[in-house]
From Swiss-Prot:
GO CC aspect terms: cytoplasm
Lineage start: Bacteria, Pseudomonadati, Pseudomonadota, Gammaproteobacteria, Enterobacterales
Keyword list, A-Z: Allosteric enzyme, Carbohydrate metabolism, Hydrolase
Gene assigned in the entry: nagB
Family matches, as Gene3D superfamilies: 3.40.50.1360
Regulation of activity: Allosterically activated by N-acetylglucosamine 6-phosphate (GlcNAc6P).
Protein name in UniProt: Glucosamine-6-phosphate deaminase
Pfam families: Glucosamine_iso
Length: 266
C-alpha cells in the first residue's frame, strides 16, 4: 500500500486529480479502448473534482473516451432530487467536462428489480474488462462506498442498510434532518473494488483518523472496510495532516520519505 501524506484537503484533491490525469493520458484511451474510472460522491472528493475540471479546461486531459462507474446511490430518492448521486455527479463534475452521457454509469436506486439492477451493473463492469482506477472516500467508521462495518470482503454490488451513524453524517446534505436521509442504498461491493486495477482512497480531517490508522497500521478486518486495501496490489491512500493524528510518527515519516518525489510541487 502507498500512503501519500499531505497537509490540506486541497493538496489531497490536487494530488488525486493529477494522478487520474496522468493515468488517463498514459493509457491513451480511444473509443474502442476507453479508460474505465470508478468515482465516489460526498464531501471529500469535491476538491479532486474541482482540480479535474480545471485541468480539463486547461487542455491537460479529455474525458471523451473515459467510461465511469459510480460507487453507490440512495434507494428511493428521485434521480432529480438535489442530493441524489446522479444530481451530485452532474452538478460537481460531469456537466463541466467533455464526457459522453453514454459513458456515464450510475446505479438506479429506483429500479423495479433491485437485484437485477445490481447484477447488470456488475456485468457491465465485466464487459469492459475491469475498472482501471477506482477513486473513493472513507467514512468515519472506515466504510468505503456504502460497505458498512462487517461487510463481506468478497461482496459484490447489492443493496445495503445504512447505519444510523452514516445517516447522521450524511444528514448535513439534507438540512440536518436525519429522517430525510434514505435508509437504504445500492453500492458496489468490497470485492468489486478489489477487482479494480488500482484503488485510490482519499482521507481528510481528524474525524477519519481512526479509520486511517486501521487501514495502515491495523489488521485486515471486516469491521474496518478500508483495511481491505492491504489486500490490493495497487492500493493508494491520499490523506491530509489531520487524518494522520492516530498514526505513529515513524509511520508518517516513513511514507513521507518514500513519497518525497511524488508530493513535491503541490
Amino acid at each position: 500500500m502507498r500512503l501519500i501524506p499531505l497537509l490540506t484537503p486541497d493538496q489531497v484533491g490536487k494530488w488525486a486529480a493529477r494522478h487520474i490525469v496522468n493515468r488517463i493520458n498514459a493509457f491513451k484511451p480511444t473509443a474502442d479502448r476507453p479508460f474505465v474510472l470508478g468515482l465516489p460522491t460526498g464531501g471529500t472528493p469535491l476538491e479532486a473534482y474541482k482540480h479535474l475540471i480545471d485541468m480539463h479546461k486547461a487542455g491537460q486531459v479529455s474525458f471523451k473516451h473515459v467510461v465511469t462507474f459510480n460507487m453507490d446511490e440512495y434507494v428511493g430518492l428521485p434521480t432529480e432530487h438535489p442530493e441524489s448521486y446522479h444530481s451530485f455527479m452532474h452538478r460537481n463534475f460531469f456537466d463541466h467536462v467533455d464526457i459522453s452521457s453514454e459513458n456515464i454509469n450510475l446505479l438506479n436506486g429506483n429500479a423495479a428489480d433491485i437485484d437485477a439492477e445490481c447484477h447488470q451493473y456488475e456485468e457491465k463492469i465485466r464487459a469492459y474488462g475491469k475498472i482501471h482506477l477506482f477513486m473513493g472516500g472513507v467514512g468515519n467508521d472506515g466504510h468505503i462506498a456504502f460497505n458498512e462495518p462487517a461487510s463481506s470482503l468478497a461482496s459484490r454490488t447489492r443493496i445495503k442498510t445504512l447505519t444510523h451513524d452514516t445517516r447522521i453524517a450524511n444528514s448535513r446534505f439534507f438540512g440536518g434532518d436525519v429522517n430525510q436521509v434514505p435508509k437504504y442504498a445500492l453500492t458496489v461491493g468490497v470485492g468489486t473494488l478489489l477487482d479494480a486495477e488500482e484503488v485510490m482512497i482519499l482521507v481528510t480531517g481528524h474525524l477519519k483518523a481512526q479509520a486511517l490508522q486501521a487501514a495502515v497500521e491495523g489488521n485486515v478486518n471486516h469491521m474496518w472496510t478500508i483495511s481491505c486495501l492491504q489486500l490490493h496490489a495497487k492500493g493508494i491512500v491520499v490523506c491530509d495532516e489531520p487524518a494522520t493524528m492516530e498514526l505513529k510518527m515513524k509511520t508518517v515519516k516513513y511514507f513521507r520519505e518514500m513519497e518525497a518525489e511524488n508530493i513535491k510541487h503541490l
